[in-house]
Amino acid sequence: VHLHGLSFFHIEMSEVASKKRVSAPSVGYLELLRSNRGFRFLWFGQVVSQMGDWFDTIAVYTIALTLTGSSRSVALIMVARFLPSVVISPLSGVIADRFSRRTIMIASDIVRAIVVLGFLFVRRPDQMWLVYVLTVLQLAFSAFFEPAKTAAIPSIVSDRELVPANAIASVTWSVMLTLGAAMGGFVAGSFGTNAAFVLDSLTFVASALLISTVRFPKRAERPKSKLTIGKALGITDTIEGAHYVRHRPRVLAYLLVKPAWGMGGGILTLLAVFGERIFPVAGKAATGIGVLFTARGIGTAVGPIIARRWTGETRKQMQTAVGIAFLMGGTFYIAFGVSRSFVWALVFLALAHMGGSILWVFSTVLLQKTVADNFRGRVFAAEMALVTLTMATSNYVVGELMDRFGISPRWVTAGVGIFFLMPGIAWFLTKQRWDRKERAVVPAKVQDVAQQLETERLEI
């Protein structure tokens, strides 16, 4: 008699043992860039594009504060940067799953190169409406670019390259923030904001040219079905994506990590206000803002590298790191808000954003490893929509707290830090529940196998 239960028992025990074994080591950063041409050129595009982004960002904040002198104008720019994604992401996710992600990225870069040149026409306070409109347009096309890029990365790197690939992307964003914020502040302060906008436009063109050299593998064809109005508008695909997430609690939890971080996103408005009112450098708001964003960039650059070395790359290790990262962000934002020393404020700001970059990279990898390719575009677009919604709301609330209610930027920052502690606590409680369920699974299966073996023995 063939003991099917024994075979099943062997498979289950093998799976348990495999979880205890150390996974194959991932590749090094330089090795990945040398050996993977597709990722290398995608990364080159990210380098030049994001450098220009920060030239643009510092210049826009400088224009708003110079023309209006109001922190509300900065908050409205933040809202204009975030809300397009909320509206467009459901459609952009469907498009990223239907069409060539390479083409989507190239087209988005070209359009953004044209849009940012519109900032050259803003010269008077009564033209601030144009700043908001151009910001909405620029970020609307970013809402097509980002989900396509994030969904495409697992297609051009192997599973063991996934963590270092996302770490490189995060570190690059951070380094470009550091260099771009510093250089953007210098260029805007020394040569004027128009120079920053022209440079940003050129970087979008360069990014499009670099991405055009990347060859993505052909994706599996979607099953053909009758075209309906719902399918044509992307409604059917959006509902399908929502159904996919709803029936996978872990995917939902991973998807909510960045939106939870985004609930404290009002810190971006606060950094602009701190740079102008509390920590101006040589009396210049643009330079003060640039230095603060530079400290933010340094923290986000080193966070994933340190976390990868200290915590490891298994699923459980990354889950633990996400919870710790939330607590880091909250604790050091509180310290930043109450710090009277500019130097210590920069240190605390960098440490807070170390936490932010850790949870950003690891939640991305957890999603990329868990979500099927034909759903990635919609899942990452939904994530982006939720992030931008929470960040837009947070920035608007922060602006109102300071302008309408007259609350000190320091107290608002400390409040943001306290708020950040709550998602960290909730994450650890959720992880604890997952761990209990996993520990209960194996004994239950072992008992089932034992009963099956006993039944087969009696039959013999």
Short names for language-model regions:
Residues 3-454, 458-460:
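Alpha-helical transmembrane-bundle signature of multi-pass membrane transport and export proteins
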